[in-house]
Each structure stands twice: as C-alpha cells, then as structure tokens.
Amino acid sequence: MSIQGQIALALMVNMAVGSVDASQEVMKNLSLNFGKALDECKKEMTLTDAINEDFYNFWKEGYEIKNRETGCAIMCLSTKLNMLDPEGNLHHGNAMEFAKKHGADETMAQQLIDIVHGCEKSTPANDDKCIWTLGVATCFKAEIHKLNWAPSMDVAVGEILAEV
C-alpha cells in the first residue's frame, strides 16, 4: 500500500473512531438528561430505590434489567419529556427534538428513533406497560451496544456526582 493509501486509511480509521467517541458522548448526554426527573418519578409512582442500581448499570454490557419498576420509571421519564404519543409509543417529532437538543445531529437522531421504533415493533405485546417498556429499553440498549455507542458509565457517574 502506498504512503498516500496508508494516510487515507489512517484518516478513515481516525474519523470512524472519532465518530464512535462522539456518539458515545451524545448517548451520555442523552442518558444524563433523560434521567434528571428520576426522583420526581420515583415519588409520583412510589417506586423503590431498587431501581437506582438498574439506572446506574443500564449501559453495562451484559447487565440484565429485570425489575418491573425500572420499566415504570422509564415510561414516566419518557412521558415527562413528552416523548410518548397517547398510545404510549415513541413520539417521533419530540424524540427527534430531544436527541438534537442534547447533541445528536439529524442522522444520529433519526437512527436513534429508528432503533426505538424497531424495538417497539419487535417487543412482544404486554398488557403491563411497565414490562413492555422494559422490553423496549432492553432491545434499545442491545442495539446501541452493537453500534458501539454505549457511553462509559464511569465518566457519566463522575459527572452526576460532580453535580451533587
């Protein structure tokens, strides 16, 4: 491979890695801002502190969230952010606005919406909306990991603690 080819390859790899890092940063910002009303939702829905561990470990690969209350909290947070339509599905316009407000460009925001929409379709129907929401969140997490967009929660937790 010529020197020019090697330089071009190095630049493409650097841009791809930079893109992943930027996506992880956006996902961290989205996660931090999404969870800001968690205490409010916990009080309103009388949710236990057991969900704190699920939110702390949410992005850890291999961590399974099984607590129904965590699904209820995610549903509550989504509602507070006006990201759900009257049927409880993702409101695409509001979700797009939220993603872009917290650092996603148009392409990434659309990809996030497409992922959630796909997860909504693939998650089995359940009369218990909390369980269904938990299924959608689990699917979303898996898809974000496939893209290598999951944020490093060590950094995110450090930022949360710095705000306290």
UniProtKB/Swiss-Prot annotation:
Signal sequence segment: 1-22
Pfam families xrefs: PBP_GOBP (PF01395)
SUPFAM superfamilies: Insect pheromone/odorant-binding proteins (SSF47565)
Protein origin, superkingdom: Eukaryota
Keywords: Disulfide bond, Pheromone response, Pheromone-binding, Signal, Transport
Tissue specificity field: Antenna.
Keyword RNA-binding: no
Gene3D superfamilies: Pheromone/general odorant binding protein domain
UniProt-listed GO biological process terms: response to pheromone
Disulfide bond annotation, renumbered to this chain: 41-76, 72-130, 119-139
Keyword Disulfide bond: yes
GO molecular function list: pheromone binding
Transmembrane segments: none
Protein purpose: This major soluble protein in olfactory sensilla of male moths serves to solubilize the extremely hydrophobic pheromone molecules such as bombykol and to transport pheromone through the aqueous lymph to receptors located on olfactory cilia.
Oligomeric form and interacting partners: Homodimer.
Family: Belongs to the PBP/GOBP family.
Name of this chain's protein: Pheromone-binding protein
Species in which this protein is naturally found: Bombyx mori
